Amino acid sequence: MCIRDRVAAALKLRDPQGKYTTVVNLQGDLPTIDPLAIQRCLAGLTNETVDIATIATRIEAETDVSNPNVVKTIAPLGEGREVAYIRDFVRSPGPEHDAPFWRHINVYAYRREALDRFASLPVSTREAIRKLEQLRALDNDLRMAVVRVDSLPLSVSAPVDLEAARMMLRKKS
């Protein structure tokens, strides 16, 4: 069961009447995320044709472009464009992908119907190969938008990251 499936199950449990029409999936491993980034993610649903919105920031370091642990969002952002439809998610861009590259930040805003549909779908072939569950949505014609943000939150995945996050949060308070 992927995180989207768990979010959908929790929403059904907490809101069986369907009162809430949108939901944000913000995971606890991003404690330093800028609240404005969350607002921008939600704003990605302003266009009625968008089913799911997420956020990305421009990749500056060449080592991040080649790092398969940094998921890249393939979308025509930049040149004054703040929101775009997502074409693909990749771990290692190929020659068919043009720079600049955008680092995906694992925050999502869903329309409830889209989340329910997404959670009911089987794992897609590309999702299984690339180990990127967001490809299940793209492979099943759910429209995803990405909103550009300027800051990259610290992702906490090791004890050293936790200490760095604590230091950052102390400085803010």
Task: Label each region the model flagged.
Residues R6-A9, A37-R40, A164:
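Alpha-helical elements of Rossmann-like donor-binding domains used by nucleotide-donor carbohydrate transfer enzymes
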Residues L11-T21, L45-E48:
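Glycine-rich phosphate-binding loop signature in dinucleotide/nucleotide-binding domains
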Residues A99-S173:
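Conserved alpha/beta core of the MobA/IspD/sugar-nucleotide pyrophosphorylase nucleotidyltransferase superfamily
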